[in-house]
């Protein structure tokens, strides 16, 4: 029996975060705290913050991947709000999810109505018919 202070005789292992246990990068503990403090429900289960964190991480990864592709298409190495806007609006499901979201400095999608485009030349059609 050791009477001194310290952890000389104990074999306690280092604590592992819930994010590491779930294989996530986003913080599970912070999401759990925000769920408790936000008055969304009286009690919060132990699996709810893990699930919500994984969903948030997946959405962030999806948007950042598409925005990175948009930045590369524009020959840029840095993602700007314009790239986020293009990524979200060109993806059908993300556009539906974030349809009412305004992105500051995002701009608009390039779109020209069909009636405003120049008409096809009549010479091209006539030569093909003969």
UniProtKB/Swiss-Prot annotation:
Motif [ST]-Q motif, which positions? 127-128
Sorted UniProt keywords:
Acetylation, Chromosome, DNA damage, DNA repair, DNA-binding, Methylation, Nucleosome core, Nucleus, Phosphoprotein
Note down the stretches annotated as region Disordered: 1-22
- One of the record's GO molecular function terms: protein heterodimerization activity
PROSITE patterns recorded: HISTONE_H2A
Instruction: Tell me which positions the record assigns to the signal sequence.
Output: none
- Residues where N6-acetyllysine occurs? 5, 7
Q: Which GO terms describe its cellular component?
A: nucleosome; nucleus
Record site: Not ubiquitinated: 119
Q: Give residues where N-acetylserine occurs.
A: 2
Where does this one sit in the cell? Nucleus; Chromosome
Against SMART domains, the record matches this protein to:
H2A
Q: How is it modified after translation?
A: Phosphorylated to form H2AS128ph (gamma-H2A) in response to DNA double-strand breaks (DSBs) generated by exogenous genotoxic agents and by stalled replication forks. Phosphorylation is dependent on the DNA damage checkpoint kinases MEC1/ATR and TEL1/ATM, spreads on either side of a detected DSB site and may mark the surrounding chromatin for recruitment of proteins required for DNA damage signaling and repair. Gamma-H2A is removed from the DNA prior to the strand invasion-primer extension step of the repair process and subsequently dephosphorylated. Acetylated by ESA1 to form H2AK4ac and H2AK7ac.
Q: What else is known?
A: In contrast to vertebrates and insects, its C-terminus is not monoubiquitinated.
What's the family?
Answer: Belongs to the histone H2A family.
Domain text? The [ST]-Q motif constitutes a recognition sequence for kinases from the PI3/PI4-kinase family.
Q: What role is this protein assigned?
A: Core component of nucleosome which plays a central role in DNA double strand break (DSB) repair. Nucleosomes wrap and compact DNA into chromatin, limiting DNA accessibility to the cellular machineries which require DNA as a template. Histones thereby play a central role in transcription regulation, DNA repair, DNA replication and chromosomal stability. DNA accessibility is regulated via a complex set of post-translational modifications of histones, also called histone code, and nucleosome remodeling.
Q: How does it assemble?
A: The nucleosome is a histone octamer containing two molecules each of H2A, H2B, H3 and H4 assembled in one H3-H4 heterotetramer and two H2A-H2B heterodimers. The octamer wraps approximately 147 bp of DNA.
What name has this protein been given in UniProt? Histone H2A.1
Q: Which gene encodes it?
A: HTA1
